[in-house]
Amino acid sequence: MARLRVAVLAGGRSSEHDISLASARSVLESLDPAEYDVVTVAIGRDGRWELGSGGGSVAETLPIPAASAPATLGAVDVVLPILHGPFGEDGTVQGLLELAGVAYVGAGVAASALCMDKDLFKKVLRDSGLPVARHVALRVGDAIDNPFGYPCFVKPARLGSSVGISKVHDDGELGPAVELAFRHDEKVLIEEFLDGIEVEVGVLGNFEPVASLPGQIVPLGHEWYDFASKYDEGGMDLVIPPDLPAAVIEQVQRAAVEAFRVTECEGMARVDCFVVGGSRVVVNELNTIPGFTATSVYAKLFDASGVPYEELLRRLIALALERQERRSKLQY
């Protein structure tokens, strides 16, 4: 049986460039060479695309030297975009792949763009009857008004990994927090603080998505689940499953799958929720390309649910090919 040729996209222009490379290395190490002919395409911080020459070898492939000569990728069966943040998770690369007619893993153009924008995402979920935190959106020049009291959160609308996010405790911290967020985006959210347990759920599938066991996020040595607690070794504990009643765990899983469906996601997502007051589930965010190392939350959640990392990759590639086959029959 011929091997599938898989192109792994890594890097990107966002502040999550290094996180993307770490995820891609794990993918390269885990794709079975007996099944897949893997090539790597790294996108530099300057937007330059470089083709790896190591045939998928981690040591030879990443990072790709900036002075690499132009090269032709050739035909591929499926693209695995392991890109986080703007210019990778926001529908831009997905649009390019759609134009090229190439199968790719993960959400499509519209779902990627929608879920990247925390403001629009919350509005769509709220209109669909799913509970979300209250928020207001600011553009440059808008008056800064916090209607929720303190503490609250200030966030760039379209960035991940908690980059540019501040937990604000009083009026004196609000202005600088908004200024920081505007360094990263042209739209900023002020969001109410939810005093609850933070849980995350993996979702896998196309038209029939399934949820993993949830995992509770417990920051260690940090006031909240910020960038440092996400990526510092020992920055947080992940408790799978959370110490919650079975009915609440099922409610979290249903909310995650419904958020996936409402936003018309495909392939994969990690849905972040809060459980407030022991039983009220609030959807916070949906990540269409979650961190993807073997020790990332998404992979751990499915491993605990009986889907090991290598099998998870295999299923995602199969889902991408299934979607491409389905769409190839459409008449435009």
For each feature predicted by the language model, list its residue ranges.
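Active-site nucleotide/adenylate-binding loops and adjacent lid/helix of ATP-dependent enzymes
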Residues: 1-10, 73, 112-197
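ATP-binding N-terminal substructure of ATP-dependent carboxylate-amine bond-forming enzymes
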Residues: 1-110, 114-116, 120, 127, ...
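ATP-dependent carboxylate activation and anion-phosphoryl transfer catalytic cores
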Residues: 2-4, 10-13, 33, 245-332
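A short, N-terminal amphipathic alpha-helix
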Residues: 26-37, 176, 180-183, 258
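Hydrophobic beta-strand scaffold residues
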Residues: 38, 103-104, 132, 152, ...
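A glycine- and small-aliphatic-rich helix-loop capping segment at beta-alpha/alpha-beta transitions
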Residues: 95-104, 170, 175, 305-306
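Phosphate-binding site of ATP-dependent enzymes
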Residues: 169-254, 275-282
